[in-house]
Amino acid sequence: MSRYQCPDCQYIYDENKGEPHEGFHPNTSWNDIPKDWACPDCAVRDKVDFIFLADSPSKETQLGVNSQLANSESGISDATPTGMAVLAAELVIPLNQENKNEGCAAKTEVLDQASTPQVVRKSSTRKKMRNK
């Protein structure tokens, strides 16, 4: 079954779901919808303006994804975008925390070393010039 999207409001007609409010039962083919049918959200009149998106996932595909999720330890398959994001976050967050702690200590030391001697040098230079 296929899906079609309205170009104005992005409403999606899914043949698997149909549009019960419009009188189209689930599994109503796009070809069975009258040509003068209007988008239920924004009333675009021309059915031909709708954009073909793709075939809807079949029940077999959905079952395959569900079993893949059930078999993974975390409940999120590593092959999905969400799974990849979770993996990346697990790797990056500890590194960032270590770098932040090291960076703060290093910056504090540099500031302490740079600011204190400069003040002393300027004041000692002024004192020497006054004494002459």
From Swiss-Prot:
Cofactor binding comment, as recorded: Binds 1 Fe(3+) ion per subunit.
One Pfam entry name: Rubredoxin
Region Disordered, annotated ranges: 108-132
Pathways per UniProt: Hydrocarbon metabolism; alkane degradation
Gene Ontology molecular-function annotations: electron transfer activity; iron ion binding
Listed GO CC annotations: cytoplasm
GO biological process terms, semicolon-separated: alkane catabolic process
Induction info: Induced by AlkS.
Domain annotation Rubredoxin-like: ranges: 1-53
Needed co-factor(s): Fe(3+)
Biased composition (Polar residues): 113-122
InterPro entries linked: Rubredoxin-like_dom (IPR024934), Rubredoxin_dom (IPR024935), Rubredoxin_ET (IPR050526), Rubredoxin_Fe_BS (IPR018527)
Gene3D superfamilies attached to this UniProt entry: 2.20.28.10
Binding positions (Fe cation): C6, C9, C39, C42
Places the protein is found: Cytoplasm
Cross-referenced CDD domains: rubredoxin
Secretion signal span: none
Function (record text): Not known. Probably involved in an electron transport pathway, but not required for the hydrocarbon hydroxylating system. Seems to be non-functional.
Family the entry assigns: Belongs to the rubredoxin family.
Protein name stated in the entry: Rubredoxin-1
